[in-house]
Amino acid sequence: MKILVTGGAGYIGSHTVRALLGAGHSVVVLDNLSSGHAQALPEGVPLVKADLLDQAAVQEALSVHQPDAVVHFAALIEVGESMSQPGRYYRNNVVGSLNLLTAIAQTRKIPIVFSSTAALYGDAEVSPIPEDAPKQPTSVYGETKLMTEQMIQAFERAHGIRSIRLRYFNVCGAVPDGSIGEDHVNKTHLIELALLTALGQREKMMIYGDDYPTRDGTCIRDYIHVLDLAQAHVLAVEALAQGAGSSAYNVGLGHGFTVREVLDAVDAVIEGSDYAPLTRELAPRRAGDPPSLVADSSSIQQSLGWKPEYVDLQGIIQTAWEWHRTHPHGFQD
Ligand SMILES: NC(=O)c1ccc[n+]([C@@H]2O[C@H](COP(=O)([O-])OP(=O)(O)OC[C@H]3O[C@@H](n4cnc5c(N)ncnc54)[C@H](O)[C@@H]3O)[C@@H](O)[C@H]2O)c1
Ligand SMILES: O=c1ccn([C@@H]2O[C@H](COP(=O)(O)OP(=O)(O)O[C@H]3O[C@H](CO)[C@@H](O)[C@H](O)[C@H]3O)[C@@H](O)[C@H]2O)c(=O)[nH]1
């Protein structure tokens, strides 16, 4: 199959592009490079440098490349920033997705795999969280993803566009050979920041709040390796190609770690090297952060046969460390 990957030059997108190629598919990437890196793409993968807000450019990409399916990653992704810049988030994530859906509806009505998020669930009352838990996002970012899921379903009802919406929990890690990895323009993710702090690029790690109702007072998240997530996309695209109906699946490991436990795991990974343990400082809560997000992923395991290979947090962090240690300035190195 030929797959159009929006946001394919980004962190998860570039790992998924490799996984799709590895599964024998061909790929075209559409990305405005606002936070992605052309260097993250394997040689020979066509890159359409375009913005989803440019409806005509999106339509043209679909007409020229005639893909069989779309995997839609392109979005702004920061929970905290979405609270202070809501307009940017609604415009980029909701209007951008609307443009893509409109273009699909006007051309080939191909199926779509969408990057959704655990942030849909907000302050979840059950843990691990099943897909039918109430959707009550605590951030604008989460709202933009919920709105996009709703638009996708409306476009299915009106135009027959099938979808698999993958609700990722916290994505981390890198290909074990350290050749590509996480290099977000604004660094906000816990593990990326901790490893850059270990490399001496930041003085200390801030812990955003220790008064949450969790075992040590810091937020709990479910950390999933980017390669396991990439494999979920391959399975989803292939299922849709074989005629699968639309669904939404959580993608996570099913157990969560507190912020302090993650920082301990980072210290354990760097222990014995020339790098000092992390200096930690308590800071106020970050707006929009729910206390705990842990996935019930049994549905994707049963329906698509997905099975995560990276189940040990230190092992996952080790792969990210390999990338950051060998590329301390990301794709600039
Ligand atoms: N990283 C996580 O932990 C996580 C968790 C849940 C969901 N997600 C979702 O996964 C997707 C990918 O996240 P990521 O961590 O790889 O982020 P990323 O910033 O590395 O990738 C996003 C890509 O989309 C591109 N992009 C953004 N807006 C665009 C637009 N208007 N037009 C064209 N291209 C545009 C960027 O240049 C970038 O290459 C996002 O949709 C995000 O919401 C990420
Ligand atoms: O320097 C830091 C950075 C983060 N945190 C905390 O660590 C946890 C994880 O934060 P982060 O790595 O920024 O991820 P999330 O805010 O949980 O969001 C990620 O995970 C979501 C799914 O759960 C995705 O939807 C988002 O796109 C993605 O950014 C949160 O409790 C943060 O408050 C700190 O304490 N200090």
Regions found by a protein language model. Give the residues of each.
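Short acidic, glycine/proline-rich loop/turn micro-motifs
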Residues: 176-179, 218-219
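C-terminal substrate-binding subdomain of Rossmann-fold SDR/epimerase-dehydratase oxidoreductases
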Residues: 191-193, 199-333
